[in-house]
Amino acid sequence: MEKLAIPSVSTGNMLREAMKNGSSLGEKVKYYMDNGLLVPDEVILDIVAERVAQSDCANGFILDGVPRTLPQAEALQAKGVRIDHVVSIEIDDSVIEGRMTGRRVCSKCGASYHIVANPPKQDGTCDLCEGELVIRKDDAPETVRRRLEVYHEQTEVLKDFYAKLGKLRLVDGGQSIQGANEEILKAIGAKV
């Protein structure tokens, strides 16, 4: 995150990169993500541990997308991965569904759009390269609903886990991006 001068370690980005590379790990990841399932803990933790050990994470990092389960949180603790703050962005499922199912990605250059918040000039066509805009499989409505079910079943318990450790910070996700960013920075004690 630029304001904090530390890297954002996004498991989603790392997993999509693994899928793009077509490795055996990438094929496993693709199966899970295409079906709205969580990627197994051991795969996620190996990827994360390798990433946070890199030199650009020496002064801190932001974990995005992990931990998602209580065993992952406990395993990160056991591996000595220090987590100072956990930010939970609170928002209604219907809003999440609308945001995710409205996303479109250029099949050629990877540019991102949203049919409501950031529509292309011409429906279905990338403004930058005129490539076709597609819906990622993990943004399909049925996949999004399944991911939300999995979140409520497996991930929501982490709020209690981190609250007991005094690390949980709740942020209203229904506000503007700028407002949410400012609230996050305040919640973790950064200067706004």
What is the role of each PLM region?
Residues 1-192:
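Glycine-rich phosphate-binding loop of ATP-dependent small-molecule kinases
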